[in-house]
Amino acid sequence: PFQTSENIIADLRFLQELQPDMIGIGPFIPHIDTPFRDKAQGDLHKTLRLVAILRLMFPFSLIPSTTALGSIAENGRELGLQVGANVVMPNLSPTDVRKLYNLYNNKAFVGKEAVEGLEELKAQVDSLGYKIVVSRGDAKRNDK
C-alpha cells in the first residue's frame, strides 16, 4: 500500500537487469486479518498500465493476468490479457480447501477462476483472439 512511483521505477530497472522468464504483477488487495486491512486496494488502471509497460520491456516473458485483477474488477483478467499479459492460471486447489488459501478478501474462487470453469475460460480467451495452451510454459526467447 505504500509503493511510490519511484519504487515502481526502481523495480522496473531491477527487472531490466534480471531479465526474468516470468513476471507476476497484481494490485494490492487488503486482508482483514492484517495491519493493512484499512488500506485502499491497488488501482486497476495503474496495474494494467504496468502490465502493458512490462510487455513492451519484456516481449518474451510470461506475464500472468492474475486472480487479483479478476478479484478487483469483474473483467480484470480479460483486461490484463488485452494489455499484454499472456498467462492465466486457474485455481487447481480442491474445492473443500480453497477458502483456507485466503490471501486477500473477496478472492475470486468460482467461475472462470476455478478449474471447474476451464471450458468457460477457454471460450473467454478465444473471444479475445487468443488460445489456451496447456504445456510446460517455458518463455520463448530469441536467444534460446
Features from the language model and the residues they span:
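Active-site glycine- and acidic-residue-rich loops that bind
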Residues: P1-D11, T67-E74
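Auxiliary Fe-S-binding modules of radical SAM enzymes
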Residues: Q16-K144
